[in-house]
Amino acid sequence: MAKEEKNLHVLEENFNQLIRERIQKFKNLQEQNKDPFEVYKVERTHTSKEIKDNYETLDGTDVTVAGRLMSKRVHGKAGFSDLYDRYGKIQLYIKINDVGEEKLKEYKSYDIGDILSVSGKVFKTRTGEVSIHITDFQLAAKSLKPLPEKWHGLKDPDLRYRQRYVDLIINQDVRDTFLKRTAVIRAIREFLDGRDYIEVETPILSSIAGGAAAKPFITHHNALDIDMYLRIATELYLKRLIVGGFEKVYEIGKNFRNEGIDVRHNPEFTAMELYEAFSDYNDMMELTENMLAYVCEKVLGTTKVIYQDTEIDFKPPWNRITMVDAVKQFTKVDFNEVESDDEARKIAVEKNIELKKELKDCTKGDILVGMFEEFCEHKFIQPTFVMDYPVEISPLTKKKRGNDKYTERFEGFIFGREVCNAYSELNDPIVQRERFMQQIRERELGDDEAYMMDEDFINALEIGMPPTGGLGIGLDRIIMFLTNSYSIRDVILFPTMKPSQQ
């Protein structure tokens, strides 16, 4: 242990010495009136990609590029370097005959991580690499701290998330992940815009946290002197817009839930919710599978993705199964034959399932859901719609046609994980008020995730909402599948982290 601490101290001292040397170089530049932070703009003519893609027409042409110096192999009177911009790498070649002795000396003093603008002629080396023969250059920003050489040598496993800016510089695969994230969201917008949906923005701060069973973040509005909540879902505001006559609406934005953090959950996450008048949950199933297949084709060129060594195919149609049939398939218990809450409670004891409230307070529906979560959901690897959830846990959903113990609700599962949730939306204001009152009773029993009463939403339903289908998708989880990312932190640029002690 003492030897390890000594080695760590030596590494830290060497690192600090490198910083001191870089700061001294910066001071020297200031004394020469070459302060890089006095550079306000770089007039670059091309990116690295444009030069490589158009080499045949640009060969011998003067260009100006800009980016970060990531390697330097300059010895004696000439040498090569690598400059990285948003699109990738371009090789640079510098020679004393072209820039002069003083400029070459200055160039040699630059450090890995410095930001440069470089002018020169496009050419191809004997090995066939498209490069720039430097005729002029300028330091556009000085890197005062060295970049880590390789992430696997770092002691803090969370440093990639805490210093995402460094992670993006070092790791091309990380940059690719977030470029795909952007492409996924763009493709979803294209799909919905092409079907005449209207993108809207609804409040993030609200006096009522509604639309989902979740624990909200609470804040206080000083001027109004009221507690307010960060939204946990966009549902109730979007339904108000359906009432207002916007027949197809969607929103992509942040939701916030004051709950645990793990590989699938971040307190701040991105969701897409949409609502369509005169449709039901069957329409939402069809829309979901078609939209996600479209996104896969657009971003990856195929509906098949490899996730954690498993091939997943997003191609429609997805599998469909009711929750009752899923439980019957994997546990041999048929809840269609269970006639009372007491009988269901006996099954819960026999199966030793974990429930979210006291057994005596659980209904048949609560126990059905507990059985599904315990024994079934992890079984659905290929995209599957699990349909017809109990009415007890679906307060915003219409009852199932022909069986009022269940609702017209489905959740989509991929690789054993829930990725979406959809309903035939409840539009009866009298029933909705009764459902909210039941949720209030659940809250009084200690369920701090139960829904709050929302009188204005009831008022909107009383004005009249047409039959409506609604869908919510956790975009971070979809992006995890399309980028083969194990943790949700790998697809969120700046995930929620406990403050560093350093």
Swiss-Prot record:
Q: Where in the cell is it found?
A: Cytoplasm
What catalytic activity does the UniProt entry give for this protein? tRNA(Lys) + L-lysine + ATP = L-lysyl-tRNA(Lys) + AMP + diphosphate
The question of whether Cell inner membrane is a record keyword is answered with no
Where, by residue number, does the polypeptide cross the bilayer? none
- EC number(s) from the headed UniProt entry: 6.1.1.6
Q: Which GO terms describe its molecular function?
A: ATP binding; catalytic activity, acting on a protein; lysine-tRNA ligase activity; magnesium ion binding; transferase activity; tRNA binding
- Protein's UniProt keywords contain Glycoprotein: no
Q: Which residues bind Mg(2+) 2?
A: 418
Its GO biological process annotations read:
lysyl-tRNA aminoacylation
How it assembles, according to the record, is: Homodimer.
Q: What is this protein called?
A: Lysine--tRNA ligase
Origin species, per record, is: Clostridium kluyveri (strain ATCC 8527 / DSM 555 / NBRC 12016 / NCIMB 10680 / K1)
Tell me the lineage of the source organism.
Answer: Bacteria, Bacillati, Bacillota, Clostridia, Eubacteriales
Q: Which gene encodes it?
A: lysS
